[in-house]
Design a protein with these regions (language model features):
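N-terminal Rossmann NAD(P)H-binding glycine-rich loop of SDR-like oxidoreductase domains
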Residues: 2-31
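Conserved Rossmann-fold NAD(P)-dependent oxidoreductase catalytic core, especially the SDR/UDP-sugar
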Residues: 34, 89, 104-153
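Mid/C-terminal beta-alpha module of Rossmann-like enzyme folds, strongest
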Residues: 2-3, 17, 205-250
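Glycine/proline-rich active-site loop of Rossmann-fold NAD(P)-dependent oxidoreductases
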Residues: 131-134, 191-196, 227-237
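NAD(P)H-binding glycine-rich loop region in Rossmannoid oxidoreductase-like domains
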Residues: 9, 35, 41-42, 47-105, ...
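Short-chain dehydrogenase/reductase
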Residues: 92-100, 138-141, 148-161, 208-216
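SDR active-site strand-loop-helix element
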Residues: 12, 36, 78-82, 121-127, ...
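Conserved beta-loop-beta element that borders a ligand/cofactor-binding pocket
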Residues: 163-189
Length: 250
């Protein structure tokens, strides 16, 4: 018997490059997946024909609180792979707080369902965002660049605020929500999972010396968080950084 059959996961941002890989990985592990997608054609037929995948055609912020609570119900975990598209409208248009607002509303949906056990919330974030729960060193030059990014690129602020919401408003002792915010470095595409390293904090500059992280490795780690309690217990309430193993100290 597949021990993952009882695991149901809600994925938002599943039409993105990493989100699709996560859905594929979860299905391969025998999990049941609900995926909120704006476009019904974002998944290949080989995936949509899977009886354990349920597609919800909607924009996540357009859902009512009641609908969001229904979609979140019976889910062991909720994963946000949301991001802003790399276009002028995606970067400077509305909603400028897509990731933050979706995280807040999804966590509120979890709380409203009053589950007897905490629900896992996994956020895909970025190494450009510091974990302010830790004393992560940052150079003056990088601090200046980050300051400019906050002024010029609204998505960077959105990523910061989403993680800050989990750190400060959900915190470490919430009875309903446990969380992990994953910080990949420069994302690349690869065909298969390779060895990767996980660190509590960045081991190289995200601005001046960024490492590489394959999307499929990020998806693999997120799936491990959901399906392996020993992995979850190690990283819950933290913001792990993920690098390709051969690139971590290159």
């Amino acid at each position: 018997m597949n021990t993952n059959e009882a695991i149901q996961v809600l994925v938002v941002g599943s039409s993105g490059a990493t989100g699709r890989l996560l859905v594929e990985e979860l299905l391969a592990r025998g999990c049941r997946v609900k995926a909120i997608v704006r476009s019904p054609g974002c998944f290949p037929e080989s995936m949509t024909g899977n009886e354990t995948l349920s597609l919800i055609h909607a924009s996540v912020l357009d859902l009512s609180d009641a609908d969001m609570a229904v979609h979140a119900s019976d889910c062991v975990a909720i994963v946000s792979c949301l991001g802003h598209t790399l276009s002028f409208k995606g970067i400077y248009g509305q909603p400028r707080r897509l990731v933050t607002e979706a995280s807040r509303r999804l966590c509120n949906a979890i709380k409203s369902n009053r589950s007897k056990v905490p629900t896992k919330f996994v956020l895909m974030n970025t190494t450009g965002n510091r974990n302010r729960d830790l004393d992560e060193p940052i150079s003056f030059a990088q601090s200046c660049v980050i300051g400019l990014l906050r002024l010029l690129l609204p998505p960077h602020v959105d990523n910061e605020k989403a993680a800050d919401y989990l750190r400060t408003e959900i915190g470490q002792k919430d009875n309903a929500v446990e969380w992990v915010a994953i910080r990949p470095d420069a994302l690349i595409n690869e065909d298969g999972v390779s060895e990767y390293e996980l660190h509590c904090s960045p081991i190289r500059s995200a601005i001046f010396d960024s490492g590489k992280t394959s999307r499929i490795n990020v998806a693999h780690f997120m799936a491990d968080l959901i399906t392996k309690e020993v992995v979850w217990d190690k990283w819950k309430g933290q913001m792990p950084v993920i690098y390709k193993k051969d690139d971590a100290l290159a």
